[in-house]
């Protein structure tokens, strides 16, 4: 029997000397703004992607110039928590070392930079390192940034859950010294074949990206069921005692390929808090050993569980931990939105959640958002918490400092603008012009599109009710569109697939309703559906639930069988 042919990335990882490749040589080459094709895959493990300005592609081609290459660098910030001092450093880098001059808050509670020339990469990574920040494993076939509910009201429980998110992030880091050697000028370590450099990942790391989240009920802003691995906090008398573990979620799919599909995670049962790291490592190593390394489109954990079966996967995790799952505990999974404005925590400190449109922290006409956050960071004594809805929380504000913080926020346009429930619950990915995978606009177009949807809600008399709407430029699902009540996924310039029927809480996927349609058709469909919804809805019924109950779309129960069916 012939040996299975692995995906190209598997050979690249094997031959990379634990993620070193020829990155250093590429960094030293000034003749091009790009890295080699192989190194473009390896640099993801170091936290960045090679991109180019797609708005300028044709113009530069006519001028016989190479594309305007730049890099997107994403930081690793477990749970989205950083200090004001760190924020000031992050802001300084954005202002001085990137062409975008902005900070992009992501849907996974971290920040990323766009428009970094190759010559600035090392400086940025070293500047971040001085503030105890890094981009290790923010991308690539490893455990990515670990999410955790900011939950500013339940401060004590949040801190306990956050501590586990931080441990998960730190313990699942790659052990290779390639990052330190290349970017921080650490001395090169000589490795031999016999050394166990990566005790968890092994020489070829994971088959594909791996995403974790820690949820603190009733909040589900981290969309815990969309992750490869999720831990839902269980508390007794306000103290964290354990987690319900879920596994096998993921949003990515490919247009036209029915073997690919988004999926929500399965519930596996309750585990004690002290066993969290054991179970995380067990799930990751089962995926390492069982995952598909031949076809990267089918490499995520969700496909591994579908292929081998829930029971077999569960048994293998229990075997590797030596611990049986207990029956899952009852918890309430609720809102996925953020609590905007001031909220007081159990520690009597105050927390201010600020809405950041599209997660883009930038000075705009009449809204100098970036300057405002910079000025707040100069006087704030607590911390900054980035949310998975691309917003930011000024957390831990003593009552005596509230007025000063609010004055700065209002002065710089960070407060005072009315945010509808729908806009406050909705997110979009970056897409054009920098993302190489984007087929249509998202971040640049989404605010105007939402304004038109809000007008329809107002027309039908339910603008006070939130609908979770999400838009992505492609089906890879960075903004989790398949878990939105209204999901719009780019198909071509100006054209989107329209998905309906996810639950408001994120416990059911949506389903394709109309394919490859333009804005006018999308709005016409929503206008008609909103009219029906207002006339036919039951008391308290959300829009997503209505579209399923009324038969507009059928419920997705088992994504492998019925997402495309």
Curated annotation (Swiss-Prot):
Free-text remark on how the cofactor is bound: Binds 1 siroheme per subunit.
GO terms (BP aspect): cysteine biosynthetic process; hydrogen sulfide biosynthetic process; sulfate assimilation
Annotated GO MF terms: 4 iron, 4 sulfur cluster binding; heme binding; metal ion binding; NADP binding; sulfite reductase (ferredoxin) activity; sulfite reductase (NADPH) activity
Cofactor(s) this protein requires: siroheme; [4Fe-4S] cluster
Biochemical pathway: Sulfur metabolism; hydrogen sulfide biosynthesis; hydrogen sulfide from sulfite (NADPH route): step 1/1
Catalytically driven reaction(s): hydrogen sulfide + 3 NADP(+) + 3 H2O = sulfite + 3 NADPH + 4 H(+)
Binding site for [4Fe-4S] cluster: 429, 435, 474, 478
Positions annotated to bind siroheme: 478
Heme as UniProt keyword: yes
InterPro entries: CysI, NiRdtase/SiRdtase_haem-b_fer, Nit/Sulf_reduc_fer-like_dom_sf, NO2/SO3_Rdtase_4Fe4S_dom, NO2/SO3_Rdtase_4Fe4S_prot, NO2/SO3_Rdtase_4Fe4S_sf, NO2/SO3_Rdtase_FeS/sirohaem_BS
Keywords: 4Fe-4S, Amino-acid biosynthesis, Cysteine biosynthesis, Heme, Iron, Iron-sulfur, Metal-binding, NADP, Oxidoreductase
Known EC number: 1.8.1.2
PROSITE patterns in the record: NIR_SIR (PS00365)
Keyword Chloroplast applies: no
Quaternary structure (record): Alpha(8)-beta(8). The alpha component is a flavoprotein, the beta component is a hemoprotein.
NCBIfam families hit by this protein: CysI (TIGR02041), PRK13504.1 (NF010029)
UniProt function note: Component of the sulfite reductase complex that catalyzes the 6-electron reduction of sulfite to sulfide. This is one of several activities required for the biosynthesis of L-cysteine from sulfate.
Family statement drawn from the similarity comment of this UniProt entry: Belongs to the nitrite and sulfite reductase 4Fe-4S domain family.
UniProt xrefs under HAMAP family: CysI
PANTHER family documented for this protein: SULFITE REDUCTASE [NADPH] SUBUNIT BETA, SULFITE REDUCTASE [NADPH] SUBUNIT BETA-RELATED
Protein name from the UniProt record: Sulfite reductase [NADPH] hemoprotein beta-component
UniProt gene name: cysI
